[in-house]
Every structure is written in C-alpha cells, then in structure tokens.
Curated annotation (Swiss-Prot):
Pathway: Porphyrin-containing compound metabolism; protoporphyrin-IX biosynthesis; protoporphyrinogen-IX from coproporphyrinogen-III (O2 route): step 1/1. This is Probable oxygen-dependent coproporphyrinogen-III oxidase. The record marks 187 as: Important for dimerization. Keywords: Cytoplasm, Heme biosynthesis, Oxidoreductase, Porphyrin biosynthesis. It comes from Schizosaccharomyces pombe (strain 972 / ATCC 24843). The keyword Ribonucleoprotein does not apply. GO terms for molecular function: coproporphyrinogen oxidase activity; protein homodimerization activity. Substrate binds at residues 104, 120-122, 271-276. It is an enzyme of class 1 (oxidoreductase). Homodimer.
Length: 312
C-alpha cells in the first residue's frame, strides 16, 4: 500500500488560487509599474480571502485579482437555483452546508487599444442532509476589446485551446461555444467581448483530473494576456476611440450586474463582501442615447460580438 496521502480537492484548490493570485499580480505589476493594494479579510468560521486591487495605475485604470475561501450554509433560494443543474441536491433541505474556493479577476486598461480581460476559476461543494458530497468546478477566461485586433483574439484563444487539448480535445470547442452563449448580453443581442472559454457545473471526470485541467488553465492566463498588453498599452488613440471604449464598458457593467453568476452568488451569500464582488465594474463607463459607432474599426468589433467566430 502507498503511504502517500492526497489532500482533499478543496484544500488543493485553496493553495492553487492563492499561488495563482500572487503570480498574476506580479505579472501585471510588471506591465503597469504600480503595485496592487492587497487587502486580506476574514469572515465567519474560517472564511477568508485576499482582494488585490489596482486603481488609477499607469496602464490599468482599474483592476482586481480576488480570492475567497468561504464556507457556511446556503439559504433556500440559492439551494433551489442550484438544483436546476444538480439533480442530486436534496430537494427537502431548506439550507445546506457548502464550501467554495475561487479566484476572480477583471482588468480594465486605460488605453482603448488594450483589451479588458476576465478570469475566474472556482471549486464548489455541498453536503446533502444524508452526508453525501456534491462537487463541481467552474470558470474560464475571456477577452473584451474595444478595438479589435484579430491577432490578439487568435493568440488568446490559441493558448487556451492548447491548455484544454492537453486534458481533453473536446473541452475547447465545448467551452468556447459555452463562453459565446454565457457572455451574451441578452437585451443587447450581442456578446460582451470575443469570448474565450467558460464552463460550470463540471464534474464529469475524476476530481483530480479536473483539478489538473483548472490548474493548467489558470497558469495559461499571463502568457495569453501580457504579450497583448505589451503591444497595445502605449498605442495612440483618438477621442472617438475613448468614447467607444466607455460605451463598451457600459455594456460590460450591464452584463455583470444583470447576468453574471458569480455576482449573483456572491450577493446571495450571508453577509456578502460587496466591495470585492463589485470590483469587476469599471472605474468609468458611459451610456449615450442612440449611440452609433463613428469609425470602421469600431464597427468591426460589432460584427464579431453579434456573430461570434472561430479563432483557432
């Protein structure tokens, strides 16, 4: 018999997100030249997290890389919503114990030539009243440019496809399509950006296999995003470009407060940490009545957000 003891997945995920958080913060600080403010917080029985935030940076107008490790009991409303995707959840329970560990990041650059980006990876488990554990992974990463550079979209998607392919060749086509559907701003009838990968309620393989997949994807972010930022952060732009960026930021805010699952879950949790949950919102955004894009490069983005394309 082997003497090797494998840590519970929840503990492995906790360590991973804390490591990835500091890795990403260091990588983005190298791009910006300004440090992130790191705010460690605690909550309830052993719950804690670290909010790493940059605001009014040299390159990044606003951004945050947050981790949270929380446990407690889900209220009946949250339990009911989760039952839709998990048949095994106890239908008679009014509340259930849960554990969640996740990392969430949104970065809004100053320069409209540089894309906003988002990342989220999480592990969730519930314990039914009979003691049975129900678990799943969720997450993904996506790119939201204002000015579309096809080479950036190809690079970002290519690296995430390679990460997916190392674990299951069906993952990228499935999760790319899922991202296109999930990031749809329904009332606008267009997507938030140019997608990436997205998955949720993922429990179809051994948990250790899925953890390895999530770990690979999480470490893919910096090489997928930093080269794009280095090319775009100092490019010249016009007032029209900036106006278009602010309009797109408004769309971003609409999606996050109306449709984003993480925002909804965070605000439903007992005593939500609102500052961290709403960290995803841009510092500045704009809504103009009957706005029409003025330049062809702005219209080029809309072709892709209205009809998502294959990038690789």
């Amino acid at each position: 018999m082997s003497d090797i003891t494998v840590e519970p997945i929840g503990k492995q995920m906790e360590k991973l997100i804390l490591d990835v958080q500091q890795e990403i913060v260091a990588g983005l600080e190298a791009v910006d030249g300004q440090k992130f403010f790191q705010d460690k917080w605690t909550k309830g029985e052993g719950g804690y997290g670290i909010s790493c935030v940059i605001q009014d940076g040299n390159v990044f107008e606003k951004g945050g890389v947050n981790t949270s490790i929380v446990q407690g009991k889900l209220n009946q409303d949250a339990v009911q919503r989760m039952r839709a995707n998990h048949e095994g959840i106890d239908r008679t329970a009014k509340e259930l114990p849960f554990f969640a560990a996740g990392i969430s990041m949104v970065i809004h650059p100053r320069n409209p030539m540089a894309p906003t980006t988002h990342l989220n990876y999480r592990y969730f488990e519930l314990v039914n009243s009979d003691g049975k554990k129900i678990w799943w992974f969720g997450g993904g990463a996506d790119l939201t440019p204002s000015i579309l550079f096809e080479e950036d979209g190809k690079h970002f998607h290519k690296l995430h496809k390679e990460a997916c392919d190392r674990h299951d060749p069906t993952f990228y086509p499935r999760f790319k399509k899922w991202a296109d559907e999930y990031f749809l701003i329904k009332h606008r009838k267009e997507t938030r950006g140019i997608g990436g990968i997205f998955f949720d309620d993922l429990s179809e393989k051994d948990p250790q296999e899925l953890f390895a997949f999530v770990k690979d994807c999480a470490h893919t972010f910096l090489p997928a995003y930093v080269p794009i930022m280095e090319k775009r952060k100092n490019m010249e732009f016009t007032e029209d470009d900036k106006e278009f960026q602010l309009i797109r930021r408004g769309y971003y805010a609409e999606f996050n407060v109306m449709y984003d699952r993480g925002t909804w879950f965070g605000l439903q949790a007992p005593e939500p940490r609102v500052e961290s949950i709403l960290m995803t919102l841009p510092l500045h955004a704009s809504w103009r009545y009957k706005y029409e894009p003025k330049q062809e490069r702005h219209k080029a983005l809309l072709k892709v957000t209205h009809t998502p394309i294959e990038w690789c």
